Amino acid sequence: MESGGQYENGRYKPDYYKGTQSVNVMPKKEQHNALVMNKKIISILAERDAAVKERNEAVAATKEALASRDEALEQRDKALSERDNAIMETESALNALRYRENNLNYILSCAKRGGSQRFITEESHLPNPSPISTIPPEAANTRPTKRKKESKQGKKMGEDLNRPVASPGKKSRKDWDSNDVLVTFDEMTMPVPMCTCTGTARQCYKWGNGGWQSSCCTTTLSEYPLPQMPNKRHSRVGGRKMSGSVFSRLLSRLAGEGHELSSPVDLKNYWARHGTNRYITIK
């Protein structure tokens, strides 16, 4: 047996007590480089986390800005709706004032011409309302010839739309023309006629020579207001109409029946029952 090799029975026995050297032992220089790389990796991860945090904060700020924008849009829509409602209320109030002013003017004119103050005290309750603008019997006798000329011209222009149709419960044209005196519409003393086909009183449009057109009533349905034509300016779809001569006969008939002409006439049940012009210019 050798002391250095410790051979015994032909075998080599390592000296365990002396310890063994590791094969993977890293040199000091490489250890230093590894520490530097670890620090760099840690700093890169920290920068990444900071960037992610900033991105999340930016996304949250964007969401908050979008929410504020939606709230502002909602407030704007609410303000627009309130403005539209205020405009509609203003128009309704103006219409009511016009009606009242026309009624007062009619009552005052009647009081001045009659020389009595009973029209002022009784206001709208007139016992026997007499028309302001009347036509004497001599002029009434000459009117049929003029009406024939107007009707011929209306056929050429496509505006003869108010030929009355006899129906049960209504007077025919002969009954309307049987009055000795025809009443003509006077804008200074009589209120504008209206139509209640939608359940609400709506003022009618002027149409033709002294005629009227409904602002809400068409040949098939009722809506307010009549929609405008997209291909023609200041025009609306076809609606119910009444010529000036028919309106004068209607006023004469209502005056003969005792109707108070100081209040607006409802033309809902007196419109022509046949077709209308395709384009109507609102005057």
Swiss-Prot record:
Hydrolase as UniProt keyword: no
Known tissue expression: Expressed in seedlings, leaves and pistils.
Lineage: superkingdom: Eukaryota
Leader peptide range in chain numbering: none
Region named Alanine-zipper: 51-86
Gene Ontology molecular function, alphabetical: DNA binding
Keyword Transcription among UniProt keywords: yes
Keyword set, alphabetical order: Coiled coil, DNA-binding, Nucleus, Transcription, Transcription regulation
One Pfam family in the UniProt entry: GAGA_bind
Biased amino acid composition, Basic and acidic residues: 151-162
Subcellular location: Nucleus
Coiled-coil blocks: 63-89
Region (Disordered): 122-176
Cross-referenced InterPro entries: GAGA-bd_tscrpt_act
Gene Ontology CC entries for this record: nucleus
Transmembrane segments: none
Family to which the UniProt record says this protein belongs: Belongs to the BBR/BPC family.
Free-text note regarding domains: Alanine-zipper domain is involved in homo- or hetero-dimerization via electrostatic interaction.
Oligomer status and interactors: Homodimer. Heterodimer.
Stated role: Transcriptional regulator that specifically binds to GA-rich elements (GAGA-repeats) present in regulatory sequences of genes involved in developmental processes.
Protein name: Protein BASIC PENTACYSTEINE5
Encoding gene (name): BPC5
